């Protein structure tokens, strides 16, 4: 097995001719050079039963050799408060107060609030070590004094913590008090927590100038020559309302702070209110406000969770917009990553006339290679074809660098077989801090990952990549469609779901027909609006997928490369904690479209019904397939033919994830049910959405909901919608050298939908 020695990413998902994309690359060493080459991606599946891998070299100004270098990644979330003037040095008496809720108190050293140079042991820091609070003072020579709490912190329990440096009394002290209410902590009022304490120690030194920024949720590694403070010892958990006072608080004042009061506001050097800025659209910013009036504002790094319940949350309000004073916490994780922040290696300005399509910058370093994918749009505001392929970029981000098969306890059970790992899986396991997590993973403290980013190497978003369950997924699977369109001579444009979110229905209206990829599971509310309006106004859609439009997502308005999802009960790897179902990036409730009265059936005709990853079935025709109104769809297919009984994904066209026709969930009543899939194993099961009381008989061998339905309905104003309801459908297009009834049916519908005339009426 080869090892990964080079990896990269680009700054944006898509661009039109005349626009620039920047590329960022890191190699294992800084020796030698690497080669870069622009390629058009055509077929990403190496399955020997298919046409094989296909790419096309495209000459570009960015092609060539570049010096190899290693680029460090800052991992973990924190807040940085620049302090070049030294105003937060606190070289006299000072006190630090914060509320904290630790999720991993026993996991090594973790900074809470600090102005500290760890290399020189200089400055001051409030931190956790071995499950206890530690307050440290270090002078310019590296001599340190510290005081350690004599009571350990309980996991997921809120505390009020005050650290005091008193140079007159030559003491340092810690005040620790639990502030548990009925809802804010793991335990309630009935638990007799023995964790309140005050401890002091003698201090013979005063804090030296660390020449670092003040950090919240970490420690400064060193005073960097380039002015950048690298954060180490990241904290896992929540911090609420940290404050820095320019005097030594008394024990009585320290304990009073546990009630949420502010001791002599005039004496504050800084007071960071993480809820400041919450408004009708959430708190879609990295800015952290200092409300002391001294202007020591901060910046979030690596997207800590915002809109999180604070120390005083009482459970009566679940929307942070309505009660910002109880949502003053940031939830930090040592394994957050919203941007690798590498230096640029090279860029490319897309030339006029470059075909709209799936592309990648292919980079090679010795025997190691990587592909950095992106999407070329048609010229802004124009269409160059009648067909639009909509790349499922929200779902690409949701699954970006997922580690389900080698980290999730249920991964093998869900797959129904032993996982098959490759070099990218091993690389993710060994060097996670290059890559970050997916929304199917949990942070190290167990919290589900709710933010995901494009600005990092995404190893499973590569042609040729195979998931741990043995087949291709997302972008490589969508290339089955691109290859088929090229093989059949169809002209098409490409856009992304991010582009649709920005441009709305106007983007779709430029085209006679819009095609999905294999798995458009994650969508914004605006994208659902655009699809519904497009179809209702006479547009034509082909949903060549399953499990589409299932989870609602939000895009960060200041960082469009960041996507947010907050999950509820359903087909999910995790559920958002109580009180945290609303997106920080737009203030709206997260969860499933179906849970917001918008089941996929209402727009695309079918919606998520079952999943399983051992093998795929095929379709048998239903009576509607012989309806004369469906003759144009079934042209060339005999009435008794099985549809899709071969393919590259699981061996058939009906598999992996399945959607069903369901009038009770909004399938239009004029819909034709053309075919339904069969031969699904017990690995396939009914989704939680359709289970009230679990009982035997919920699997593919027994339950009627375990099926995919091929449907067609016409809409008002000449529109039409065709749905195949299976993730593995596209994998059958090239089966038997493209000579099969999946290809034939898809071609029948696409050829009709391209025409400048209304879709056939039903």
Curated annotation (Swiss-Prot):
Assigned EC number: 3.5.1.56
Cystine crosslinks: none
Role according to the record: Hydrolyzes N,N-dimethylformamide, and to a lesser extent N,N-dimethylacetamide and N,N-diethylacetamide. Has no activity against the substituted amides N-methylformamide, N-ethylformamide, N-ethylformamide and N-methylacetamide or the unsubstituted amides formamide, nicotinamide, acetoamide, benzamide, acetamide and acrylamide.
Keyword annotations: Hydrolase, Plasmid
Name assigned to this protein: N,N-dimethylformamidase beta subunit
Keyword Hydrolase: yes
Organism: Paracoccus aminophilus
Reactions mediated catalytically: N,N-dimethylformamide + H2O = dimethylamine + formate
Induction info: By N,N-dimethylformamide.
Keyword Hydrolase: yes
């Amino acid at each position: 097995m080869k090892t990964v020695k080079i990896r990269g990413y680009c700054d944006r998902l898509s661009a039109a001719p005349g626009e620039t994309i920047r590329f960022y690359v890191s190699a294992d060493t800084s020796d030698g050079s690497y080669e870069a080459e622009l390629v058009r991606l055509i077929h990403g599946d190496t399955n020997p039963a298919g046409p094989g891998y296909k790419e096309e070299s495209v000459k570009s100004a960015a092609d060539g050799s570049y010096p190899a270098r290693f680029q460090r990644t800052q991992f973990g979330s924190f807040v940085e408060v620049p302090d070049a003037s030294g105003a937060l040095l606190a070289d006299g008496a000072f006190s630090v107060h914060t509320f904290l809720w630790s999720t991993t108190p026993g996991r090594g050293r973790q900074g809470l609030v600090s102005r500290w140079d760890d290399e020189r042991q200089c400055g001051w820091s409030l931190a956790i070590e071995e499950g206890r609070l530690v307050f440290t003072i270090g002078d310019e020579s590296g001599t340190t004094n510290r005081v350690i709490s004599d009571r350990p912190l309980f996991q997921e329990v809120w505390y009020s913590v005050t650290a005091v440096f008193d140079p007159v009394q030559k003491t340092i002290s810690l005040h620790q008090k639990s502030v548990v209410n009925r809802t804010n902590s793991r335990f309630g009022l009935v638990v007799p927590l023995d964790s309140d304490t005050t401890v002091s120690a003698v201090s013979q030194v005063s804090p030296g100038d660390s020449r670092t920024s003040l950090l919240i949720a970490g420690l400064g590694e060193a005073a960097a020559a380039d002015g950048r403070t690298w954060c180490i010892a990241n904290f896992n958990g929540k911090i609420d309302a940290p404050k820095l006072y320019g005097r030594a608080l008394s024990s009585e004042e320290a304990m009073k702070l546990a009630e949420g009061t502010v001791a002599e506001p005039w004496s504050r050097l800084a007071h960071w209110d993480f809820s400041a800025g919450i408004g009708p659209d959430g708190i879609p910013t990295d800015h952290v406000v200092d409300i002391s009036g001294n202007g020591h504002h901060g910046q979030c790094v690596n997207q800590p969770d915002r809109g999180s319940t604070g120390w005083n949350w009482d459970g009566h309000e679940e929307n942070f917009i309505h009660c910002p004073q109880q949502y003053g916490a940031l939830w930090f994780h040592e394994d957050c990553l919203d941007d690798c922040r590498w230096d640029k290696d090279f860029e490319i300005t897309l030339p006029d006339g470059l075909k709209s399509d799936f592309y990648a910058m292919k980079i090679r370093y010795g025997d190691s290679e990587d592909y950095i994918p992106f999407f070329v749009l048609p010229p802004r505001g124009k269409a160059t074809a009648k067909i639009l392929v909509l790349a499922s970029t929200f779902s690409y981000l949701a699954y970006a660098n997922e580690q389900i098969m080698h980290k999730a306890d249920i991964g093998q059970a869900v797959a129904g077989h032993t996982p098959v790992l490759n070099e990218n899986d091993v690389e993710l396991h060994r060097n996670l801090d290059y890559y970050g997590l997916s929304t199917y993973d949990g942070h190290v403290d167990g919290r589900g990952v709710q933010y995901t980013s494009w600005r990092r190497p995404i190893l499973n978003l590569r042609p040729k990549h195979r998931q741990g369950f043995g087949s291709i997924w997302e972008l490589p699977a969508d290339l089955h469609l691109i290859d088929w369109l090229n093989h059949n001579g169809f002209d098409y444009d490409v856009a992304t779901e991010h582009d649709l979110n920005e441009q709305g229905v106007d983007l779709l209206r430029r085209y006679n027909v819009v095609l999905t990829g294999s798995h458009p599971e994650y969508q914004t509310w605006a994208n659902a609006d655009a699809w519904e309006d497009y179809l209702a106004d006479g547009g034509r859609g082909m949903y060549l997928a399953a499990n589409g439009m299932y989870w609602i997502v939000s895009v960060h308005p200041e960082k469009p490369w960041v996507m947010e999802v907050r999950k509820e009960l359903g087909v999910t790897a995790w559920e958002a904690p109580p009180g945290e179902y609303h997106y920080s990036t737009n203030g709206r409730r997260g969860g499933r479209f179906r849970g917001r009265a918008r089941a996929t059936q209402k727009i695309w005709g079918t919606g998520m019904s079952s999943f399983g990853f051992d093998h795929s079935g095929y379709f048998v025709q239903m009576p509607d397939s012989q309806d004369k109104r469906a003759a144009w769809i079934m042209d060339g297919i005999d009435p008794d033919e099985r549809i899709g009984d071969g393919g590259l994904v699981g061996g058939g066209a009906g598999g992996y994830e399945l959607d069903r026709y369901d009038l009770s969930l909004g399938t239009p009543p004029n819909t034709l049910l053309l075919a339904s899939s069969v031969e699904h194993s017990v690995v396939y099961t009914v989704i939680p959405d359709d289970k009230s009381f679990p009982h035997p008989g919920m699997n593919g061998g027994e339950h009627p909901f375990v099926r995919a339905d091929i449907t067609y309905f016409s809409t008002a104003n000449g529109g039409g919608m065709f749905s195949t309801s299976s993730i593995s459908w596209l994998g059958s297009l090239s089966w038997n050298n493209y000579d099969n009834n999946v290809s034939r049916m898809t071609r029948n519908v696409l050829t009709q939908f391209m025409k400048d005339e209304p879709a056939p009426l039903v």
